[in-house]
Amino acid sequence: MKEITIKQLNEILTKHAEWVNSCGVKGARADLRGANLSGADLRGADLRGASLNNANLWYVNLKNANLSDTDLSNANFCCVDLRHANLSGANLWYANLWRSNLWCANLSYANLLGASLNDVNLWYVNFRHANLESANLKGTDLSDTNLSGANLRYANLRGTNLWSANISNANLRYADLRCANLSDANLSGADLWYTDLWNSNFNGAKIDFPIACPEKGSFIAFKKVKDDYIVELLIPEDARRCSATSEKCRCDKAKVLSITKLDGTSDGVDTVYSKHDEAFAYKIGEIVEVKDFDDNRWNECSTGIHFFVTRQEAVEY
């Protein structure tokens, strides 16, 4: 860790200001890579385009600072004051922001790939078009934040408060949103494929993600059961049906049409049993029904007859 005195830091900031104001003609870009700046008072500092990757920023005051387009990758931001800071376009790749205060900060277009944001104050933060892929946001308060167009693939958002957040057109593929509060959130246009939304609160949320099976009418479906048999089902017109964020669907009743092996051939078996409940039988010609069907579509693994619209999907499951 590179130690920096207050005098050295002031000189670096002065030269950096000249570099910024002259568009790189005068002065020198601030090179604070690996520097120990813990406890420094940098309120309102202009660090646009500076290099601070791997820097130690414990308890640094960066309130109202301009850190746009700054390299902050792998930096340690524990307990840092970043209220109203401008971090637009900044590189925060795998940065540790544990217990920092980012109230009203601007992180639009910032790269937060793999960043740790545990116990961070993120009220009213602007994450518009930010890259938060694989970021750890577990249990954070993101109420009223702007996450429109953000990349949240594989992000950990379990137990997160996203009340009234703008998540429109965001990419949430494979994100973990179990037990999250999404009440009054705007999820219009969001990519929710394979997102885990188990036990999340969607009261008042704006969401237009379609289910993976026909919403009306009867149709043919398939499911894999015990001993790797494929059951062909007729989902009747009056069956309740839903899906969460994958191709797997659920319904409350269906008629068994046929039972075949994985290769599509029949060995004469007319009754097979569920993989998850060996007392639940599927017999050709009979109607099976689940009385305690869970109408919450986001509880993908909950009660119901699980199925796929195509036979190939059932075979591969």
Please place each PLM-identified region on the residue numbering:
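Intrinsic low-complexity/IDR segments
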Residues: 1-39, 43-44, 48-49, 53-84, ...
